Amino acid sequence: MYIVIVTMRTILFFGIFFIFIFQCAKCIELKIFEDLLEVRSQSGLFFPLCSKSFHQKYGEQACASISSTFLSYSTVSLQQYTYSVGCTTSVCFTFLSSFCKTGVKVFCSPSLCASGTLQIGSKCLSISTVPVQGYSEANYYCNPATLISSLKPTEIESIRDTILPTFADTRLFLTSGLRQGATWKWGNGDTVEQEVTGTGRCLALQAGNLVAIDCDSEAYVFCESGRECIARDKEYSGTANRTSDGKMCLMWNDPTVLFRRERDLEILNHNFCRFVNDADGKKSATPVCYTKPNELSQCYIPPCPESFNDVVPIESGDSCPIGSISCDNGSKCISEKFQCDYEVDCNDGSDEHNCEDYLQYYELIGAYRLADNIIEVWTFIPHVQGCARKCRESLLMCEAFSYEPKSQTCLLTDTSQTFSSLARKITSLYYRRRFSTKDVEFQVENKVLYATKSAKKGHVCDDNYSREKLSSICRVLGFGDPIYTVESHQSESSLGPLQPTTLHPTNPSFDSPSSVSQMRRTSPSATLAPRLPAWNLSCLREPNCTSTVISTCEPIRCSHCQQAACGDGSCIRFDQLCNGQIDCQSGEDEDYCRANSFRLTNGSDTSGYLEVLFRSRWEPICADHLNGKISNSICDAMRLGEHGFILSTNATISSGYNVNCDVDCSIRRSSSCTRHARISCISQNGMSSASQCGLRYVEVNARDAAKSRIARVVGGFETVPGAFPWTAALRNKATKAHHCGASILDKTHLITAAHCFEEDERVSSYEVVVGDWDNNQTDGNEQIFYLQRIHFYPLYKDIFSHDIAILEIPYPGIEFNEYAQPICLPSKDFVYTPGRQCVVSGWGSMGLRYAERLQAALIPIINRFDCVNSSQIYSSMSRSAFCAGYLEGGIDSCQGDSGGPFACRREDGAFVLAGVISWGDGCAQKKQPGIYTMVAPYLSWISAIINGQPV
């Protein structure tokens, strides 16, 4: 690579470079080889430059060719010919110097930027030679470099003065900046501090100003490469890929490296030298890379000069705003959330100093990915330590997690017995929580679980854990089923009140250590246990916790039984539980025979074969003793209607459970079952629950992709009144302007997207309109309500995950008619099958304006892999979201449709709410389909809100 210099003015071409001296007509080419300055002869070969022809400007120009600055030179004796330089008034030329045997060694400063890039401030930049089409192509163009990030005002000024004058003022240069809600963020997570003008979700530089543009816009690209030197905070992100002894580096994601490496290293799709942490968490002395599957070798990268560290201290007297901290060197303020997230944000790395090793609490099980029983999904987690931290800080008793470095996705689960919920995946790591130190010993004595840690022995406290939790603890430690006694699980009539007293029986996911389905009942007259040393489970998991507590807590009791245990530790079969016969000496096998949850299988959402959840197992219900009263109670418990119609059945079973629902529903096992119960749930007005929701009185077929394009719901069609009666509008109360869509759930609740309220969360700012069709005219069918409350999903932070909210309006609420109807909720096991076509509806943007009349479109669910690969921006899609639309463009939901329904038709004709319109990049553009929040994963939360339960 060489630099072109014309009349002493440097002109940068991104590609091939030459050195011209004086004028283009009189030019020579120079390069440095092993510190020796060489000149190109007329034959095209390079030879050492004779020391007598050397001038300092030659050294400066040669160092510039490797993006360095000239420091000094020295002469050196040679055993070969050299070449000299001669110049006339019009041309310079080279000639052989037969008698000159001394050359010149040139010493340059460290390489700051790779050849082909230009140093601007602390950045190494290059510019695309051709425009690219959109954000996704821009990222692809820059790879393995990245789109420019964290532009400082001084850097923008330098770009404006040195680069932009050669381009038209209208030219756009894409950066890594993206709008996330109301905030602009650079690709590295930093907040954009400068003012941004224009509309759009992507950030570009135009004539020295930051402007917002559509992410599909054609633009040129500023690519930012890593510095070819080591910053003083031991950071290197350059492109050196050879070791100090010249060996080529292997790819970090080479399969032989992945399978044989000992350290927990980041999986990278390149072979560049990088700093890594050793087994003690200390950063390596130099950048390294793999040259063999199990051999890390050092790379030589020079240190950056002090001026290139680009540290600008915070002005004296300034302080960081609330919620931020200052880097140790005072270079900048960062969010407190970025501290110890295992991603360096401070130039000196101080935000990651003295951070806890969260992985010490977990053991690596293998290359698996959670596929079920997921309680939380976190995206943009840059390191597995961050995922471990999320699990440790989870309020939902996280027991294990899987982490995918490539997608930076973290999945949490509340159970450690998850092998049935795991899928093999080589790029994912599955960790399970462990007891914190290897010197913790567990044993069972007299049916009581004891722990010994730091030579201190005590029983392990049962902190009101659920039956499922206790079972997990006992079995993970290698013991059998937990032991329950009649004393701790007496009949309800002899005990004090249950706390809490409300829990919906169809929501086992709401079960907590104090839930009614798992309640540890305590008799007011019970004798307190003696005060003995005891361990809390949380303390056993803490490396630094070594103190027992003097506690009256009930101990955890474990058996050695594989199926079920009596209170005295004797073992029984599972089918001996709740069978009407006392098999345990104290009768505890017939205690706690309550039915907590029912479900329907092999049918529709409102009819099918009955099963009951008992001891974490779904068991069949016998048809033999089922009557109308019991089926009514079961349907009511499942919220599928007030009446249960018993259907004929041909399914035979040898054993199952009989149900009795006098007060609460209890069960008894029967070994004389002949048929599996099958029912259909019916409402008070004689219609099935399916007829209560998702119905419409006007039949309109949504158009498919073959129809001509009509601007949006883009590419859809204009409906007629009552066509999609569950579609509601959220409007600005003052201006009556359309704001977002929503869907009717019941008389007082609607569901929408949480991001609709990012700018203003005040309920007084909005009103809800149902039964509308033309929002510019009064149809006479509208019902208008003010908002009483907005319920955000607890984990919602921004548009990219958990983008769902429930609106509450005052009682008595909506009057249902042919223009206003609730939509059905999907079943918990609703499958988002690629290719399934469903309907979106709303009054959102039609490209140039909002629609006056309700629009609708039929669009298919898109395979997640195809969606993510259609555009880089879709890597932001969370696991609780899905993609729908057409990759070729033309039909989609758009601005103003957010919060509206993605409705799928069931076999019985009713519509279910499969998704909530969330976000997208552009409207109906090629390779930019819409993103929708799944509804099925949030059913428990939705039920809790509707039923007024705590969440």
Swiss-Prot record:
Which positions are glycosylated?
Answer: 241, 329, 464, 536, 544, 602, 650, 776, 869
Disulfide pairings: 320-333, 327-346, 340-355, 387-410, 391-398, 461-571, 474-584, 545-561, 558-571, 566-584, 578-593, 622-681, 635-693, 661-673, 740-756, 838-904, 867-883, 894-923
Q: What is its EC number?
A: 3.4.21.-
Residue limits of the PAN domain?
Answer: 355-435
Q: What's its top-level EC category?
A: hydrolase
Q: Which positions make up the signal peptide?
A: 1-27
CDD domains per the UniProt record, alphabetical? KR, LDLa, PAN_AP_HGF, Tryp_SPc
Q: Where is the SRCR domain?
A: 433-585, 598-694
Which Gene Ontology CC terms are recorded?
extracellular space; membrane
Tell me the ranges covered by the LDL-receptor class A domain, including all copies: 319-356, 557-594
- Could you tell me which residue ranges the Kringle domain spans? 234-304
Query: Origin, by domain of life?
Result: Eukaryota
Coiled-coil features, chain-numbered ranges: none
Q: Where in the cell is it found?
A: Secreted
Keyword presence, Transcription regulation: no
What keyword terms does UniProt attach to this protein?
A: Disulfide bond, Glycoprotein, Hydrolase, Kringle, Protease, Repeat, Secreted, Serine protease, Signal
User: What's a GO biological-process term for it?
Assistant: larval development
This molecule's function is given as: Serine protease which ensures proper pharyngeal pumping during larval growth by regulating the levels of extracellular matrix component fbl-1. Independently of its enzymatic activity and probably by acting as a ligand for tyrosine-protein kinase receptor svh-2, involved in axon regeneration after injury by promoting the generation of productive and stable growth cones. May play a role in gonad development.
Listed name of the protein: Serine protease svh-1
Question: Which organism is this protein's natural source?
Answer: Caenorhabditis elegans
